[in-house]
């Protein structure tokens, strides 16, 4: 169960803080609801407390997970799918899971493609969305703000020569 003050992640909206827990009567049934403030979009999200995990709400990763996250951003297989539509859908679906490592994989794949052939406008938007979602969670894990989290993500990405990776994968 989540309590007021818990830092959580909603798979579609990013990371936030539980700001309120209250009982509400909906369709004649009294239920507990959580109000989650999502700073990324300044959204107040109301989620049934007993169904929060079922919709994918989870706790923010801990600082100890950041090293694994950095490894995911910098190493691993690169998907060479040539069909833009399939590649876009697969990346979008990975982002929708809300899984921090799936989002990091999307960022890695799009960073390589960006340094190779470049990104389409749709992929560029997806790349920016993935970085914002990841930063919304990294900020809580690192105890910083979103800008500092984005700087950390960009620093990790830039630590790898994606141009060399793209060239080796024949994406140049």
Residue positions per predicted region:
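A positional/architectural concept
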Residues: 1-57
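Charge/polar-rich, low-complexity and marginally structured segments
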Residues: 50, 55-172
């Amino acid at each position: 169960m989540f309590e007021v003050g818990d830092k959580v992640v909603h798979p579609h909206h990013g990371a936030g803080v539980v700001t309120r827990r209250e009982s509400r009567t909906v369709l004649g049934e009294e239920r507990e609801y959580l109000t989650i403030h999502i700073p990324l979009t300044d959204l107040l999200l109301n989620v049934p407390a007993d169904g929060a995990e079922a919709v994918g709400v989870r706790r923010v990763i801990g600082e100890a997970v950041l090293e694994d996250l950095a490894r995911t951003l910098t190493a691993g297989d690169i998907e060479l799918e040539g069909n833009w539509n399939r590649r876009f859908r697969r990346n979008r679906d990975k982002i929708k899971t809300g899984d921090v490592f799936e989002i990091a994989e999307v960022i890695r794949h799009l960073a390589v493609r960006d340094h190779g052939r470049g990104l389409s406008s749709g992929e560029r938007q997806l790349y920016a969305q993935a970085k914002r979602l990841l930063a919304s969670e990294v900020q809580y894990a690192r105890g910083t703000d979103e800008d500092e989290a984005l700087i950390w993500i960009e620093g990790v990405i830039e630590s790898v020569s994606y141009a060399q990776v793209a060239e080796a994968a024949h994406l140049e």
